């Protein structure tokens, strides 16, 4: 769950992290009154949306009089702010944050994230903070400092000094930075955060450290023990389809493709999406109906899928371990009849009562295309999305070796999913390939050398 800047700064203040004085406003008049109450002759008006890149998109304005505050707020409120992180539709601005201006001598980047490879909370810092930190990380990665914290030992003084020295701090700033770093670390742990970011952390002209911006993301699965933070959720900043999915216990993420996926299990869902990508199309969504999938949940899943008008075909891929395939088949038939599905549907069912499930689908008389395995399912749904008729599946066997998807793979882009174009280890990729039905060489005794694969859905990756 994401928090607005003003909400994150309220939490910062509770942990003694220095921030500029500021107030929230929902109208131009409130913004002007807030600036008057703050005093001074320099203010910053910031649009409150759950996205970065606001400064370059006109969502942050520096003004020097009350009329300027009012005009800046009027230009933001009620509008949709489009940044590099929002997509073309942007996010609605219902609040602005009016903050006292600060004298900036230097800008620093500082954040805490969980490094899943080392299983450690990790500080990431750079002396080149500010709006261009992504460019700095891409072009000059040597300017990024990373320090992992052992979960048993906790944050140590030498690690704080290591970060401070790397950021070029000196004198009393080192002790000040150590206090700030410890406060951020406690916040991260106690609030069940998945990200705490300060960009920029400024050094003022007086030499003080001040958090000029604040971003906090909270782990969704821990919200049950963070009721105060859960109450801060802003539904206007969330995808309405994803929000509706969560109300039905469905894990749904919108993507840019045109083939919808309905799968039980996150790993199988990722493998399914990979094969769609390998066969030349892109998935329209990530949808995990979970291990306890029911007929009702399948119906709701179809409704969510069909709310996306870009979808040209649907692939249902269910492995019945806990869930019974015959119940899922009944749910699919009911959903297709109830919702009125007008686009091709390909179904692959394996596991508990799979034979009975196939009979249910065949007896329904509906235009549902069965698939014998995952590769066959991906091939058929891609052909149907293109408007061509798939070849009927053979009665048995796994198909010719020439039909293996590896021959069609674009070697410039390894498959996988990370919602914000992150990094997935090669070991994880191997697991996905295995789940997707690829053969492993039984003679290979040594593991392959680990490497990193950059993964972007909807964009090509460099080799």
Where are these regions (language model features)?
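A cross-taxon signal for low-complexity, glycine/charged-rich
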Residues: 396-399
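Amphipathic alpha-helical interaction surfaces in cytosolic regulatory modules
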Residues: 324-345
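Catalytic core of bacterial c-di-GMP phosphodiesterases, primarily the EAL and HD-GYP domains
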Residues: 321
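Intrinsic, low-complexity polybasic segments
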Residues: 391-394
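ATP-dependent carboxylate/acyl-activation modules
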Residues: 1-198, 202-316, 326, 337, ...
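Rossmann-like NAD(P)-binding element
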Residues: 110, 459-463
């Amino acid at each position: 769950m994401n928090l607005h800047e003003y909400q994150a700064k309220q939490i910062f203040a509770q942990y003694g992290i220095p921030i500029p004085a500021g107030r929230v406003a929902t109208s131009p008049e409130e913004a002007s009154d807030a600036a008057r109450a703050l005093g001074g002759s320099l203010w910053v008006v910031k649009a409150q949306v759950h996205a970065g890149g606001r400064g370059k998109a006109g969502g942050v304005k520096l003004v020097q009089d009350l009329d300027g505050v009012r005009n800046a707020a009027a230009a933001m409120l009620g509008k949709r702010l489009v940044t590099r992180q929002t997509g073309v539709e942007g996010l609605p601005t219902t609040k602005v944050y009016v903050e006292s201006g600060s004298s900036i001598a230097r800008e620093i980047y500082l954040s805490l994230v969980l490094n899943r490879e080392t299983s450690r909370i990790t500080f990431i810092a750079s002396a080149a903070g500010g709006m261009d930190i992504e460019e700095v990380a891409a072009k000059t990665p040597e300017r990024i400092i990373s320090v992992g914290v052992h979960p048993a030992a906790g944050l140590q003084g030498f690690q704080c000094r290591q970060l401070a020295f790397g950021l070029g701090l000196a004198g009393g700033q080192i002790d000040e930075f150590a206090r700030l770093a410890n406060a951020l670390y406690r916040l991260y742990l106690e609030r069940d955060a998945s990200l705490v970011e300060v960009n920029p952390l400024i050094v003022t002209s007086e030499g003080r450290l001040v958090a000029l911006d604040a971003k906090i993301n909270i782990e969704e699965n821990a919200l049950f023990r963070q009721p105060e933070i859960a109450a801060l959720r802003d539904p206007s900043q969330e995808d309405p389809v994803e929000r509706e999915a969560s109300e039905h216990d469905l894990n749904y993420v919108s993507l840019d493709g045109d083939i919808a996926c309905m799968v039980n299990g996150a790993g199988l869902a990722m493998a399914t999406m990979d094969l769609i990508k390998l066969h030349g199309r892109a998935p329209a969504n990530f949808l995990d109906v979970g291990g306890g999938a029911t007929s009702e949940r399948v119906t709701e899943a179809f409704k969510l899928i069909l709310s996306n008008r870009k979808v040209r075909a649907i692939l249902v891929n269910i492995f019945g371990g806990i869930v019974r395939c015959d119940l899922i088949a009944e749910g699919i038939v009911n959903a297709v009849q109830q919702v009125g599905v007008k686009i091709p549907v390909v179904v692959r069912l394996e596991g508990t009562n799979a034979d009975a499930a196939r009979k249910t689908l065949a007896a329904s008389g509906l235009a549902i295309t069965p698939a014998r395995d995952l590769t066959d399912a991906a091939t058929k749904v891609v052909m149907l999305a293109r408007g061509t008729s798939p070849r009927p599946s053979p009665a048995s066997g796994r198909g010719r070796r020439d039909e293996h998807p590896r021959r069609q793979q674009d070697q410039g882009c390894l498959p996988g999913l990370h919602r914000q174009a992150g990094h997935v280890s090669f070991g994880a990729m191997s697991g996905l390939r295995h789940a997707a039905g690829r053969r492993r060489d039984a003679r290979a005794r040594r593991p392959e050398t680990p490497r990193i694969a950059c993964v972007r859905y909807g964009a090509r990756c460099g080799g």
